[in-house]
Amino acid sequence: TVKADTYLINPAGDWTLGGLDADSGLSGRKLVVDAYGPNVPIGGGSFSGKDYTKVDRSGAYMARKIAVDLLKYHHSQEVMVKLAYAIGIAEPVMALAIIDGEGHDLLSSNYLDYDLSPQGIRLALGLDNYHFVDFSTWGHFGRHDLSASWC
């Protein structure tokens, strides 16, 4: 039995679209490589083949930005940020930062001054200004040659 405060069952309504018209992405390849290798857990959604309105891609970029910001702020050795979204819900259902092994609930604290909705992420990271084909070759993170706001 799964116990939770809230159960979200098809919060966006009927799921009638599929393929390239929906949230499927093109290939789904290189998931682990695109997300730091095997050291960082991934949700299974690919970046390439999806536009940045999909939180598989933009949420990962925002998690990276938040992790780097918290790393600098706390002068930490390691920060991992986990964001979880439900289809049809604009805000994340979970936002957790693990800072040097200690967990912090980012939704119930004053750690964040970020809008974590897809629209908020788009604006905060300036995602309208990038040509994402540039990221498909050498990765999505740590690309100082592309001056991405989340790198």
Which ranges hold each PLM region?
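Structured core elements
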Residues: 6-9, 16, 25, 32-34, ...
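Internal helix-turn-beta structural module
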Residues: 73, 78-151
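Conserved mixed alpha/beta catalytic, RNA-binding, or beta-rich assembly cores of soluble enzyme
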Residues: 1, 15-19, 24-78
